[in-house]
Amino acid sequence: MKNFLQQINSYIKEAFNAGKYLYNGLSVTFDHLRRRPVTVQYPYEKLIPSERYRGRIHYEFDKCIACEVCVRVCPINLPVVDWVMNKETKKKELRNYSIDFGVCIFCGNCVEYCPTNCLSMTEEYELATFDRHNLNFDNVALGRLPTNVTTDPSIKPLRELAYLPKGVMDPHEIPASDIRVGKLPEEVYDWMRPTSNENKDKISNSNN
């Protein structure tokens, strides 16, 4: 009789533990069902880079004075500045400028220290290629402006993920009461563009 009661007690404990483990596992599953997905259907959807995103470098040939400051501040001496000295004007004449993005670490030093602001960071990050030599951009390739994510007709800019409230790290934790929920990036831009602080106050209040 004692062994029988022990078996029943053991069976009840095992059944209780099995139910508890099953509940713990399903609770995680059901908790994620009510969250918005964090994945992106790339390349049909793209994340909107942040304002200070360090993407491909844009170069303006007409502004460059061939001072080579970008080469000196670069940790790996990457930019190649090809220039000749004009004996008549006694000034440098720029012939070619190139950056190999297969080696670039996108630190932004060249952009920060450029005296003429001929270098700037863009939001372009799609630099994949089949040949690594194609990553060596000359002054012509560097001068091309990338297509803005919010204005590219071939893709759908991702909603909401780029406009998380302050203190929220995960995209699915954005409050449902937030004013920006369900709006496209250009609509958010239009909302925040007015000079009055009324809209900005509403957004800040919704984040609290």
UniProtKB/Swiss-Prot annotation:
Name all 4Fe-4S ferredoxin-type domain ranges.
55-84, 95-124
Q: How is the cofactor bound?
A: Binds 2 [4Fe-4S] clusters per subunit.
Q: Which family does it belong to?
A: Belongs to the complex I 23 kDa subunit family.
User: Which GO biological process entries does UniProt record here?
Assistant: photosynthesis, light reaction
Q: Which cofactor does it need?
A: [4Fe-4S] cluster
Which branch of life, at top level? Bacteria
From the Swiss-Prot or TrEMBL record, state where the protein is found. Answer: Cellular thylakoid membrane
Give the Gene Ontology MF terms in alphabetical order: 4 iron, 4 sulfur cluster binding; iron ion binding; NADH dehydrogenase (ubiquinone) activity; quinone binding
The record gives the membrane topology as: Peripheral membrane protein
Q: What class of enzyme is it?
A: translocase
What reaction(s) does this enzyme catalyze? a plastoquinone + NADH + (n+1) H(+)(in) = a plastoquinol + NAD(+) + n H(+)(out); a plastoquinone + NADPH + (n+1) H(+)(in) = a plastoquinol + NADP(+) + n H(+)(out)
A GO cellular component annotation in the UniProt record: plasma membrane-derived thylakoid membrane
> What's the protein called, per UniProt?
NAD(P)H-quinone oxidoreductase subunit I
Alphabetized SUPFAM superfamilies for the sequence: 4Fe-4S ferredoxins
What Gene3D superfamilies does the annotation carry?
A: 3.30.70.3270
State where [4Fe-4S] cluster 2 binds.
74, 104, 107, 110
Coiled coil (UniProt feature): none
| Annotated positions binding [4Fe-4S] cluster 1 | 64, 67, 70, 114
| Subunit organization | NDH-1 is composed of at least 11 different subunits.
Q: Which HAMAP family match?
A: NDH1_NuoI
For this protein, the Enzyme Commission number is: 7.1.1.-
